[in-house]
Amino acid sequence: EATDHYIRSNLGMRHFAIKATEDEMHQDKNKCYQNWSTPLETERIIELLLNVRLFDDEYQGFIKTTMMSCETGKDRLARPLQGNKAIIGHKTGTGDRNDKGQIIGMNDVGFVYLPDGQSYTIAVFIKDSEESEAATARIIADI
C-alpha cells in the first residue's frame, strides 16, 4: 500500500496498481493479476528516474547502476543491442505459470543510450503467454 500510495501521490501516476507482495503472488497466483501497469506508465517512471531528482543522489544513482548491471534477461531488450556500444539499464520480470500453463507475465523495462548520443526508454509486457520462456523472451527482443 505504501508504494502504491507514494507513486500515486508523489509521481502522479494513475495507470497501475500494486496490491500484492512477491510472497503473496507466489502463494496465490491469481494475486499476480492485482499488480499491473501499462507500458507507457512504466516508461514515465523510467523517464522520471533519469531526469528528475526523486530520491537522494546516492539512492537514485544506485537504482540506475543496478539497472545497468542487470544480469537477467540478456535475451530480451539487451539481445538486439549486443555487439554495439549501446548502454542499457533494465529490469526484468518473469511470473509463474497460471493454472492454464501460461506464463502470467514476462517483461523488460529500461533505458538505452545509443553510441550516436540518442536515448530512449522502453517497456515491453507480455501477459498470459502460451509460449516457452525462451520464445517469449525472443518476442520481447524482436520488439
For the regions a language model picked out, list residue spans one by one.
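Structured C-terminal helix/loop/strand segments within mature extracytoplasmic catalytic/sensor domains
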Residues: 44-87, 92-143
